[in-house]
Amino acid sequence: MIEVKNLHKSFDGKKILEDISAQFLSGKVNQIIGQSGSGKTVFMKSVIGLFRPEEGQVLYDGRNLVDMSGREVKKLRQEVGMLFQGSALFDSLTVLGNVMFPLEMFSNMTCKEMEERAKFCLARVNLLPEKHHLYPGEISGGMQKRVAIARAIALNPRYL
């Protein structure tokens, strides 16, 4: 379980997060929703250790994120799949390449295994093989979202 307790974060003296607490259960789809500019991205970047909270704790299975080594934090980031409002796809990569990207960065898979895993994830979101060679600008916004979902599940994260 990821447990966030009383998180506070400011930038340039402006409070972005104030006394935020939440729990994320492994194997469940967790959602953070709110108005534009409400701090959702800052919150999630704090949860995965990209931002250090000024106050509060982020606990992974009871261990405080700030007490973990860089290697441990990197491993934890692989266990959290995140989707944002924008699809955040790489325009220079094909649909298949976008889904393979996290596998190339964080897995020990062979090229063939990465391609098979990416194709499996794309099939799970009903993106047909004839779309795999296309670039994000060549597919609809809905298809782009599905590619982003496939990429988020590619590493089989504990938390989504």
Question: Could you say what each language-model-derived stretch is?
Answer:
Residues 93-101:
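Short coil-to-helix segment of the ABC ATPase nucleotide-binding domain corresponding to the Q-loop/switch region
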Residues 56-64:
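Conserved ABC transporter NBD signature motif
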Residues 63-64, 112-130:
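Conserved ABC ATPase "signature" region
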Residues 33-35:
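The feature captures the beta-strand-to-loop junction immediately N-terminal to the Walker
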Residues 134-139, 143:
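Conserved ABC ATPase signature
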Residues 48:
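Helix-to-loop junction immediately C-terminal to a conserved catalytic motif
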